[in-house]
Amino acid sequence: DYATINSQKGINNEHSLFLLVEGYRDASSKLLNELLTAEKVDWLKIDSLIYPILFSFRHYLELVIKDTIRNYNLIDKKINSDEIGFKKEHSILKLWTLLKNRIVENYEGYDKETIQQCEIENTSVENMLIEINNLDEFSFGFRYPFQIVDYGKNINSKIVYMFGELKIDLNNLNENMSKLINYFEGLNCQSVHILDEIQTVKE
C-alpha cells in the first residue's frame, strides 16, 4: 500500500486542498468517535487524544473556509486557477468575516424568511467560531503545551502553559463539531456548484 501527494491537481488546482480538508475533518471525527464509543473509559487516552482532535478540527475549519474563499475568488474572477486565492491568515474569525461578507451576496434572490433563517444560522456559527478563536487564535494552542513566545530561541524561557485547567464535554464537542461540519460543507459545496456552472457554460 502507498499514498500519493499531488498525483492529481484538478482543473482549478483544487485537489490537494480538497484532500487536506477531507483528511483533517475525518481525522478529528474518527478520533473523537473512538473515544465516545469505547467500551471502557481510558482517561489517559482521552487526555492525550483531545489535543490532536482539537488541532485537526480547528485546522479543518481554517482550510475549509480558505477553500471556500478561494472558490468565490475564482467565481468573481479575482484570481486565476494557478493562483493561491487566499491571504496568509490563521485567525478563524477573520477568515469567517471575509467569507460571510461574500456569501451574503448570495441572499439577493432569497425571500425574507429564508434570509432571516440564514442570518440566524450565521450568528450561531459565528458564536461557536468566537469560542474556538478565543481559545486558539493562531493555531498554536493545541500543537504545544507551553506558550512559545520567542519560538524556542531561548531554551531557558520560563514555562507558561497555553491553557489553565480545561474540562471538555466530549458529547457536546461532538454535537458542535457536527453542526460546524454540516454548515461549512454546505457552503463549500455551494461554491463548488456555482463555480462548476460558470466554467461549464464558459466551455
Which positions does each model-derived feature cover?
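Domain-scale activation on soluble regions of proteins
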Residues: 1-203
